[in-house]
Amino acid sequence: SGSHDEMVKSNGSFKLTVKIFWILAAIMLAIVLQGILRDGVSTWMPSYIAETFKLDNKISIFTGVFLPLFSIAVVQLTIFLYKKIPGELTLTGFMFGAGVISAFALYATDNTSAVISVLFAATLSGSMHGVNTMMTCMIPPYFGKYGNISFMAGLLNFCTYIGSAASGFGLALFSENFGWHNTLLLWSMIALCGCLLCLSITRIWNKFKIE
């Protein structure tokens, strides 16, 4: 009987370990994706505006200033919505969804209006800042019962830096080879992947929180 109980306990621990692994893997990948978009948009949007609409550098620089300011407002909105919408990954999925709509709208209106492009880019960038806030600040405490919260927070923040590094080199290379129009489509696809990834593990995440 004792041996049977130990086997059941061991099997339960293994299943929990596997569950934690998949949850963590999905969350880390989603954070990398938001890092690519968040820093990619803020870094390359001024260049896109300048090259696409042949505008003065001062205007494109203004774009680089406007995006972070708008993102601050979106982060505050995210914190407000967090109190209304149950489930961290549900809200994160919605924020990614807003990013999908913004990125695709940016793609669909490419080369039509600088103002419209900036507004959609600001919404996309802001959405990713909201995602980052949720995933790097609200999620780590739930892993406290399994280890060090600060380690988990550091690990998830590291994933953001991976995304940032990937956007710095990867998006530049992609835009040079395939053009801005396809780069905007790529942003849409990245946001869609993040949205589907978060929503796909929402149920298992909600169960994990109460175990």
Stretch-by-stretch model annotation:
Residues 171-191:
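A membrane-interface helix-boundary motif in multi-pass transporters
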Residues 33, 66, 70, 123, ...:
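Small/hydrophobic positions within alpha-helical transmembrane segments
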Residues 88-138:
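C-terminal transmembrane helical hairpin of 12-TM major facilitator-type secondary transporters
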Residues 17-79, 132, 136, 167:
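Extracytoplasmic gate region of multi-pass secondary transporters
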Residues 1-27:
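Juxtamembrane intracellular "pre-TM" segments in multi-pass secondary transporters
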Residues 74-87, 175:
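Helix-to-loop junctions at the C-terminal end of transmembrane segments
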